[in-house]
Amino acid sequence: MAIPVPHPFSGASRLGPRASALVAVALCGCSINLGSLSPEPDQASPKAAPAGAGVADAQAAATRGQALARSGKTEEALSEFDHAIALDPNNAQALYSRGLLHQGENQHQLAVDDFTAANGLTPQRAEPLLGRAVSYLALDKIKEAAADLDEAVQADPQNAQIWTTRGLAYERLGDKTKAADSYGRAINLRPKDEVARTGFARVGGKAG
């Protein structure tokens, strides 16, 4: 089920207006297929698998949480995600969704923890890496953000949001070459992306 990603920086002034705007566009313009955010069948889990009924109940709670999140009922959604994770700690969908809610409340370390858990369960997916990178940017952990984004573009090279956010990370690291390359790739995928276009110009990118 695809749901809009919540706004991650309702008051994140420490990123500065330019960075906040870029990251907001990077995430708010996309929808994530959370229903497919589940571990591969052959992945071993460090925790004992819960009983079948617990897994089903956890998935039902996660689905309710998504519906509540779409309706703007953040507290109720968080309660459902907490319940889902208590029933099934390996529910990557609930972990990722809860991470987005924490991110929307600027609780970025909690978001990082949830995205890390979701990534451990679904290492083939780019979404938890992108989410964690955004929170790392808010925490001024720019190198960690760049590392996540490097991995994310390998997992989903057609995702313009990831390339735009990677451009921000490398721009903040002072690597204009990688920033320009990232912004340029975002523009190739989404030519009307004004954030990527202005970032590309800002770092002195040359049209190829």
Where are these regions (language model features)?
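Helix-start (N-cap) detector for alpha-helical repeat units in TPR-like alpha-solenoids
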Residues: 58-59, 92-93, 126-127, 160-161, ...
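Structural signature of tandem alpha-helical TPR/SEL1-like repeats
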Residues: 71-83, 104-117, 139-151, 173-185
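Position-specific recognition of the canonical hydrophobic site in helix A of tetratricopeptide repeat
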Residues: 62, 69, 96, 102-103, ...
